[in-house]
Amino acid sequence: LRTWLHPNCFAAAPLVAKGCERAFWAAFLVWADTNGGPALFAHLPEMPVDGALAAALRAEAAAQGRRIELVYREERALLDSDLAPADYLEQAVRGKKRKELRRQHARLSEEGKLKLERYDDDRCLATWIDHFLALEAAGWKGAAGSALAAHDATTGLFRDALRGAAERGRLERLSLTLDGRPVAMLANFITPPGAFSYKTAFDERFARFSPGVLLQLENLALLEHDTIAWCDSCAAADHPMIDGLWTERRAIGRYSVAIGGAAKRAAFDRLVGAELSRSPRGIGD
């Protein structure tokens, strides 16, 4: 038994009203006990390890005498600082690398008219989405069959998610264009007090200029956003690009929680104990 997680989503924490966390978990665990079927436990993937929701889960499980284990944990890049963008960049990236990025920006500018575009509304949204999907599909993800445009379902998810966010004033889009053609694009979901950097793509023909990194430098403007305290990169742990720019980390984990009667819970104890003893990071996939 597990909570739902779409392959193109990077957080699976249930959406719970502030102050209702304990009540939610109490109701969920009762439901899981009676509706779990043959499942030995409830598996909760992609959960933030810190915060009120996880704390309430642990507290409610303890109050019910129910075993819960964090069976996997990783840390991914997070932007969380009171510094201004320029000051943050200076402390996050060594001087030699900053000099190289300035050189790449200058060289890319020599290829044509370089322009940054930033939108926080639905202007040109349909065209922007088309350009993003084409840009991503033209790269290695397209060759691997993992681009959003490779499947109707993921294309639809992306279009619907961005349209819905834009309608609610929750979408920010950035593009770096060269002579009007996008060479790097990214989409942020703005969800005060946090944000999520959902998807990014770049033109691999210009890889020597690192357009994706150059666009992420512009994305540091999130630090000056009035309602945003942090931004989750939504990237894999140890990501070779964003880990070098965003120095804070967000712990994400997978919890397993005992459900059902005594027999199920005894079997879960044996299973989770064996798995945790084999893996220092917990149970993998």
Model-derived features with residue positions:
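Acyl-donor binding region in acyl/amide transferases
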Residues: 1-72, 189-257
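Low-complexity, flexible helical/coil segments
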Residues: 77-82, 114-116, 151-157, 209-213, ...
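A conserved beta-strand-loop-helix scaffold within acyl/acetyltransferase catalytic domains
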Residues: 1-4, 45-208
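C-terminal catalytic domain of photolyase/cryptochrome flavoproteins
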Residues: 149, 172, 226-229, 234-285
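Solvent-exposed residues in well-ordered beta-strands and their adjoining turns
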Residues: 17, 80-82, 258-260
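Short intrinsically disordered coil segments
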Residues: 29, 91-98, 269-277
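A generic secondary-structure signal for well-formed alpha-helical elements
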Residues: 35-36, 112, 136-144, 223, ...
